[in-house]
Design a protein with these regions (language model features):
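Structural alpha/beta surface segment adjacent to cysteine/selenocysteine redox centers
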Residues: 1-75, 79
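C-terminal cap of thioredoxin/glutaredoxin-like
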Residues: 54-166
Length: 166
């Protein structure tokens, strides 16, 4: 489904128009970073991309972050199909992951079932409904409710959360 159609159905025609006109908050933030969103991209299943990120996590947070950056740029800016094995495996190779191992991981029904379970848990326990999603807590106060929010946020949001946690 085209992203504009998806946005109109989920958030209403104003969200779709904002995405088309590139005047929305997210587009403005992205433009400051030299990123232009492809408003012709297609919405599709993200389970395999989540499985690939899961695979990358076994090589450490830095490798995982490198991969996520490649995936985000490919999908949001270049309009690559996030459910395409071709795109996902190119991204894996780009960050130095083994293509055959990555393919085996993303095509594994057991891995997909586990990752779907983790996604469902994130939705039910933390209200995760999109990316990016942030959960910030003070580990020295484990009984205190963590802060959880989705979407692009200005630096002031993070500063405010960190100040409240200290």
């Amino acid at each position: 489904m085209p992203v504009i159609t998806y946005l109109a159905r989920k958030y209403g025609p104003q969200a779709a128009e904002s995405a088309k006109s590139k005047s929305g908050h997210l587009h403005q933030l992205a433009a400051k970073l030299g990123i232009e969103f492809d408003s012709n991209r297609i919405i599709s299943s993200t389970i395999k991309s989540h499985c690939l990120v899961d695979y990358a996590s076994s090589f450490g947070v830095q490798k995982q972050n490198e991969l996520v950056e490649v995936l985000f740029r490919g999908y949001f800016a270049d309009g690559r199909l996030i459910s395409s094995n071709e795109f996902l495996l190119e991204a894996a190779e780009k960050v130095g992951l083994n293509r055959a191992e990555a393919e085996s991981h993303i095509d594994s029904t057991a891995v997909q079932a586990r990752v779907r379970g983790e996604v469902d848990e994130g939705r039910s326990d933390y209200g995760v409904n999109g990316v990016p999603h942030f959960i910030i807590s003070n580990q020295s106060e484990p009984n205190k409710q963590p802060y959880s929010f989705s979407g692009a946020q200005p630096p002031e949001t993070f500063t405010s959360v960190f100040e409240r946690l200290l």
